[in-house]
Amino acid sequence: MRTATIKRKTKETDIEVTVNLDGAGVSNAATGIGFFDHMLDLLAKHSRIDITVKAVGDLHVDFHHTTEDVGIALGQAVKQALGNMAGINRYASMLMPMDETLTRVVIDVSGRPFLVFKADFPRDKIGEFDTELVREWFQAFAMNAGVTLHVETLYGENSHHIAESCFKGLARALRAAVAIDPQAAGEVPSTKGQLGG
């Protein structure tokens, strides 16, 4: 089983994340941020990755530290669960519609962290959640998972729909990229013979 647990504690947050890449999409997200928990639930459901997140953060300050640190820990957990990445598909892409919104997500599970994020949110907040934190989460996740990630909302008018299409698009792309290719079982998908540099 490709599983991992990451514990991360700072003066700002105390976080524990567990993932099972070969799960059923079961989510147990408890960050204290309702909208963010909703996005993590979507990520688990549509990636088929079991995700448990327990986070206590300085929400009296704002949601930034908790959102970013969950991205860091979840990225680290995915990276650890992947191990040497032998047999994975590595590459995947997804066009994700959400009503009037369409987002394109392309991923390379390469060990080479990079993020391109292009999404314009019409509103500064979704409920109490700052929309700028969507990019912050994707940045933290990509850097710590060691993935190259391109997220681009092609069009959209509703901030909730834009955020949701980004998370669902990542979920479906990640699901395909980390899946084991039976024709390449045990092979690292790189001419170098290794991933990560």
From Swiss-Prot:
Looking at the Swiss-Prot or TrEMBL record, what is one Pfam family this protein matches? IGPD
List cystine links: none
Q: What is its EC number?
A: 4.2.1.19
Catalytic activity as recorded in UniProt: D-erythro-1-(imidazol-4-yl)glycerol 3-phosphate = 3-(imidazol-4-yl)-2-oxopropyl phosphate + H2O
User: Does the record bear NAD in its keywords?
Assistant: no
Q: Which InterPro entries match?
A: IGPD_sf, ImidazoleglycerolP_deHydtase, ImidazoleglycerP_deHydtase_CS, Ribosomal_Su5_D2-typ_SF
Pathway entry:
Amino-acid biosynthesis; L-histidine biosynthesis; L-histidine from 5-phospho-alpha-D-ribose 1-diphosphate: step 6/9
Respond yes or no to whether keyword Nucleotidyltransferase is given for this record: no
Q: Which GO terms describe its molecular function?
A: imidazoleglycerol-phosphate dehydratase activity
Main site of residence? cytoplasm
Task: Give GO cellular component annotations, separated by semicolons.
Answer: cytoplasm
Tell me where in or outside the cell this protein is found: Cytoplasm
Quote the protein name from its UniProt record: Imidazoleglycerol-phosphate dehydratase
State the gene name recorded for this protein: hisB
Q: Which family does it belong to?
A: Belongs to the imidazoleglycerol-phosphate dehydratase family.
Q: What class of enzyme is it?
A: lyase
Any GO BP annotation: L-histidine biosynthetic process
Q: Which UniProt keywords apply?
A: Amino-acid biosynthesis, Cytoplasm, Histidine biosynthesis, Lyase
NCBIfam families documented for this protein: PRK00951.1-5 (NF002109), PRK00951.2-1 (NF002111), PRK00951.2-4 (NF002114)
